Amino acid sequence: MNADPLPSLTKYFKCPDSILNFAVNEHLSTREGFFRLGADTVCYGRCSTERLSKEPGPDLLDASGNVQVNGTGVLLPFDPEEIVRNLRQERYAADCAQYRRNDTIIREFYYLLRPWMPLSFRKHLQRIYLKGWDKLSFPKWPVDRTVDHLLQQLMMLGLRSKGLESIPFIWFWPEGANACAIMTHDVEDNPGKLFCSQLMDLDESFGVPASFQIVPEVRYSVEPEFLEGIRKRGFEINVQDLNHDGRLFQEKATFESRVKKINRYGKEYQAVGFRSAILYRNQEWFDHLDFEYDMSVPSVAHLDPQRGGCCTVMPYFVGGLVELPVTMTQDHTLFNVMGDFTNSLWQQQIQFIHRHNGLMNFIVHPDYILRQQAQDAFKSLLGVLGRMRQEDNLWLALPRDVNRWWRQRDAMTLSFRGSEWCIEGEGSERARLAFASLKEDQLVYSLAEPGNAVHANELNTSGKN
């Protein structure tokens, strides 16, 4: 077995690439399909068995019985690089009927008449359009972390193959933060634009930083004074689509024409981040975006017009672009589609993502919190985030700061020097050394003491065989 490191695993954990080795069965299926690894991890791609499913469901083949572990490495019945890529970039959705919608005419008609539709009527139409969302089994609702779970399973297999108790890695967040949260405000129409100043007051009153995604054309005028008013208060400005008509990713020619203007607006606005309107997306085209990061891909998209989801609660790279996935239910969906002002769903998602050390990416539109009931729910959310920063070591950051950190972490190295593991590279003074350990068939994380070096015997990476 010719075993090598897994790029997706070492990039995710930022662990030494010389310790764990994996190989892929040479005889994979010719077609891609759904299967699972263990009870809970749905995969999509080729496998060494031909019994793959066209749709996700309860009776998927479990490929874990075909995994071989020995002292030299792990032989896998699938290519994990392919599986991770297919999930993150939503390639499973393009090939699966339950995610596709033949609704171009309906969408065109809706966005043509939308300016004259009252909100109550739009909510009614959206509920009809989204009917059946709760029957979708994959990705998991209300948060999906299939990619993260898959990589954790691979880490466990790798540790077992070498008889290791633990392996060092660079912790996910700076200063040892347990998790990260970003607040983003998509400004859709002029009433929302007019409310931005009051919204900044609310954010500031709870000490929550935020970014404002601005639509450059059609929806409202974008004066330099408006942008400067946001910027000088310490908030971030990003570009949101071009004109918010839902057509950006409809045709490649349309996208290529519009993205040139979008990129120009990015430079004019001094924006390093982008988000598409209504979270329409095609990650295969993201290389045309002249931005450092994107925020257009949901973790799970059952309640979005474009179904699918990237199946992770962690940032990842799409080429040279950092993707900060939308991991929290949008305010519009929560308030206007589900009719929920209790924050119970947000609380459920917050607790889940915090427990799994992930990224909470909120979208709260100024347009949809004009009513007092919605404002009260938003204030409650801000209060929760403020308390978690103080009590639960939550990193509250601007999206651009998360982008910068994720790039710095990706460029860092974990080296063994003398008798110590050392983190090196720009930003390493904020990095924390951690280790992943096998305990009762679970992967458990723990942090080393502050500092960027630790003695090897503290991490117990010596093999048993």
Predicted features, each with a name:
Residues 272-273, 293-297, 393-399:
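Acidic/polar loop patches that form or flank catalytic/metal-binding clefts of enzymes
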Residues 238, 275, 294-295, 361-363:
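Conserved beta-strand positions in the central sheet of alpha/beta enzyme cores
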Residues 1-213, 217-222, 284, 288-289, ...:
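Terminal accessory/targeting
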Residues 234-244, 291-307:
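Acidic, His- and aromatic-enriched active-site or binding-groove loops in soluble protein domains
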Residues 224-232, 311-316, 348-352:
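Short amphipathic alpha-helices and their capping/turn segments at secondary-structure boundaries
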Residues 252-256, 310-312, 409-417:
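Short, surface-exposed amphipathic charged segments that create phosphate/polyanion-binding patches used
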Residues 171, 185-283:
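Catalytic cores of extracellular degradative/oxidative enzymes
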Residues 295-299, 304-335:
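Catalytic pocket-lining loop regions of alpha/beta-barrel enzymes
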